[in-house]
Amino acid sequence: MDAIILAGGFAKRMWPLTKNKPKQLLNLAGKPMLDYVFDSLDNLDFERIIVSVNSFFAPQFQEHLSSNSKDKKIELFIEESTNENEKLGALGALNLLFKKKKMAGPVFIAGGDNLSDFDLIKMIDLYEKSNSDVIGLFDVENIELAKLYGIANLEGNRIIDFVEKPSSPPSTLAATAYWLLSESGINNFFTYIEGGGDRDAMGNFLTWNVKRNPVLSVSFKGSWYDIGGLESYSEAQNWLEKRP
C-alpha cells in the first residue's frame, strides 16, 4: 500500500507566514509540520510515501527532503500550479496523481496539515478485514463545534450520510483528513470526477460516495488539529510543546 500526503495548497488564510513558505514546512515545537505527519505514518509500512505539492513551493520541499529525510520511500509529486488561481484542489490533485502514477489502490491519504495522536493502524486493520474504504473520524463532543466541520452519520461503523458544516448536525463525528481508498474506492473516485464532481473539498466526494458505496469509519479519541488558520496553528503549537 502507498500513502499520499496532500500539501499542495497555498494557505492564504495564514499569510504572511505562508506567503513565501509552505504551511507544511512551518516550524511547530522545534520541527516542520510535515515531519510530524511523517512520524504518524512511520509504523504503517507503506511501500511509498508520496508528498503532493504545488510547483511554486516544490523547491523548498525538495530541499527539506534532501537535507532531512533518509527515507528512500518518500518522493515528491509536483502539481502544475504556481498560484492560488491555478490550484487543482485536493481532489483535482489526487485525480492527477492517481493517473500519472497509475495507482489502482489501496492507498492511504493524509492531509499535510492534520496533526494527531491517533493510532492510524486501526484504519488499515479495518480495511484488511472489510476491503472497503475507511475514513478517520474524530468526536468533537459539541454540537455547536460540529457545525464547523464535515459531519458523519453512522449505522454501526458505516457512514450512511455526510454533510459539510450542517446547521443541525446529525452527530458530533467530524471527518479528518485521514482516508483509505480501496481499489473499488479509486474506481468510484474516477466515476465521481468524470461525472463533473467538485474537485476542491474532499468532503464533497465523501457526500457522494457514501450514498453509493460502503464507506466504513474508525472513530478516534485523543487530540486532532486541522491547521487551517493562525488560531489552529497556535493551538497545535501549544499541544506539541506540552506533550511528554
Question: Residue spans of the language-model regions?
Answer:
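Anionic-ligand binding region
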Residues: E141-P169
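N-terminal nucleotide-binding beta1-loop-alpha1 segment
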Residues: M1-N20, L26, L44, P214
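Conserved N-terminal catalytic core of the sugar/cofactor nucleotidyltransferase
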Residues: D2-I5, R13, K31-A110, K122
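Active-site metal-binding loops of divalent metal-dependent hydrolases
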Residues: F10, G112-N114
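Catalytic-core segments of class I nucleotidyltransferases/pyrophosphorylases
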Residues: F108, L115, I124-E128, R158-P244
